[in-house]
């Protein structure tokens, strides 16, 4: 029997997974997966759980926003043998999922994981221990996504980020930047 680790953030995107969780789990079970389910409790929880349990499964599926996805990827990058990754978008904006054509309806995304064709995607590393697949950002407004409370995102969706961004305008300042790659350095 194939084994799956399903990690989800119950607070992401207006807590929408709560009404669909049983249907998602049923899809995976009927597809022949032995499931281990983990509900995230704190920041970096997905990363820690995936790093610890990911080596024991064939597939890791995460559901949440871009932050949950990035934590899951960071956990997977610590593994010697990497399982497949599935993603069920459940965040406020789901930019990454939209860019890949992953269905916004959670049960359809679960079916894609079960019946779809795996494909490779590039990852990057930021600050030596955090990985990403979609965006690594720095400078003005990058703190907005971290400063925006989950309650506000659940209430307002994407507009919550806009409000937090407007609040940040008064505190804009220049940043020192240094980028190193292939023996080259760019610094300003």
Which residue stretches match the model-derived regions?
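Short Gly/Thr/Asp-enriched flexible loops that form oxyanion-binding sites at enzyme active sites
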Residues: 68-80
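A residue-level signal for conserved active-site and pocket-lining positions in enzyme catalytic cores
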Residues: 9, 66, 144
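Hydrophobic packing residues within well-ordered alpha-helices of enzyme cores
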Residues: 24, 46, 72, 96-97, ...
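ATP/NTP phosphate-donor binding region
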Residues: 1-63
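Short amphipathic alpha-helical segments
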Residues: 18-20, 73-76, 98-100
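Short beta->alpha linker loops
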Residues: 41-44, 64-67, 91, 139
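Catalytic core of DAGKc-family lipid kinases
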Residues: 31, 78-188
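Short, glycine/acidic-enriched loop or turn micro-motifs at the edges of active sites
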Residues: 12, 69, 92
């Amino acid at each position: 029997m194939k084994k799956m680790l399903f990690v989800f953030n119950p607070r992401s995107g207006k807590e929408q997974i709560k009404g669909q969780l049983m249907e998602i789990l049923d899809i995976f079970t009927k597809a022949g997966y032995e499931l281990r389910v983990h509900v995230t409790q704190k920041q970096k929880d997905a990363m820690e759980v995936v790093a610890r349990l990911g080596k024991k499964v064939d597939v890791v599926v995460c559901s949440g926003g871009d932050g949950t996805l990035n934590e899951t990827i960071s956990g997977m990058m610590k593994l010697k043998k990497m399982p497949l990754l599935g993603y069920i978008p459940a965040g406020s904006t789901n930019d990454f999922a939209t860019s890949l054509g992953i269905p916004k309806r959670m049960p359809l995304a679960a079916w894609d994981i079960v019946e779809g064709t795996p494909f490779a995607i590039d990852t990057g590393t930021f600050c030596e221990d955090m990985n990403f697949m979609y965006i690594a950002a720095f400078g003005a407004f990058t703190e907005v996504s971290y400063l925006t409370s989950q309650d506000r995102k659940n209430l307002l969706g994407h507009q919550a980020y806009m409000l937090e961004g407007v609040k940040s305008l008064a505190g804009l300042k220049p940043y020192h930047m240094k980028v190193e790659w292939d023996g080259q350095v760019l610094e300003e």
